[in-house]
From Swiss-Prot:
HAMAP family: MinC. One of its GO terms (biological process) is regulation of cell division. Belongs to the MinC family. Cell division inhibitor that blocks the formation of polar Z ring septums. Rapidly oscillates between the poles of the cell to destabilize FtsZ filaments that have formed before they mature into polar Z rings. Prevents FtsZ polymerization. SUPFAM superfamilies: Cell-division inhibitor MinC, C-terminal domain (SSF63848). It comes from Escherichia coli O1:K1 / APEC. This is Probable septum site-determining protein MinC. The keyword Cell cycle applies. InterPro entries: CAP/MinC_C, MinC, MinC_C_sf, MinC_N, Septum_form_inhib_MinC_C. Interacts with MinD and FtsZ.
Length: 231
């Protein structure tokens, strides 16, 4: 046990940054509502940073903050703020002004190449080959997600496509996050806190006992979540 009541350690987190290109709160609110509707499992109640570097018109910050918060997003900071008055308004509300890392210069465009002949379309897949620990959230937009290691309780996997877990699955798995009801979840050891396909979900105590801790395949059949052995 540590001899001190607290300990400070460096860490890093993956956060979504919302770049504001419009100073009208109502316009921002509607745009965010539309975006959240596309991937509610990933964006609903998500922590975000607001980047205001592209705003040229004066901003009613109180109204803007309320408009963003009304969507369910949780504003944890603001970046890209160069206006002293706006900084003061933001800090008065208790939000930190964050400094982003320097943007890298764009790489030169590659030389044009002749199109390949007889190529076969390849489905994009996000591959994670390290353990997914508690508190981590991994999202695979517009593609499948494959995890070749264990997923701890408190971790969250989200994919617009299918989810494959080739290890112990103790966290939450949400496939078809953008609404695709044809997606599936494949686990070699199903011990999940929650499984969801296109919004249809089971909590851990709803997973049939005969499949708990076993290799399983989940999919929607007639709009209901089902599970069968993974052969």
């Amino acid at each position: 046990m540590s001899n001190t009541p607290i300990e400070l350690k460096g860490s890093s987190f993956t956060l979504s940054v919302v770049h504001l290109h419009e100073a009208e709160p109502k316009v921002i609110h509607q745009a965010l509502e539309d975006k959240i509707a596309q991937a509610p499992a990933f964006l609903k109640h998500a922590p975000v940073v607001l980047n205001v570097s592209a705003l040229e018109d004066p901003v009613n910050w109180s109204a803007m903050h309320k408009a963003v918060s009304a969507t369910g997003l949780r504003v944890i900071g603001v970046s890209g703020c160069k206006d002293a008055q706006l900084k003061a308004e933001i800090e008065k509300m208790g939000l930190p002004i964050l400094t982003e890392g320097k943007e890298k210069a764009p790489r030169p465009a590659p030389a044009p190449q002749a199109p390949a002949q007889n190529t076969t379309p390849v489905t994009k897949t996000r591959l994670i080959d390290t353990p997914v620990r508690s508190g981590q959230r991994i999202y695979a937009p517009q593609c499948d997600l494959i995890v070749t290691s264990h997923v701890s309780a408190g971790a969250e996997l989200i994919a617009d496509g299918n989810i494959h877990v080739y290890g112990m699955m103790r966290g939450r798995a949400l496939a078809g996050a953008s609404g695709d009801r044809e997606t599936q979840i494949f686990c070699t050891n199903l011990m999940a806190e929650l499984v969801s396909i296109a919004g249809e979900y089971w909590l851990s105590d709803q997973i049939p006992a005969e499949f708990y801790g076993k290799a399983a395949r989940l999919q929607l059949v007639e709009n209901a979540l089902t599970v069968q052995p993974l052969n």
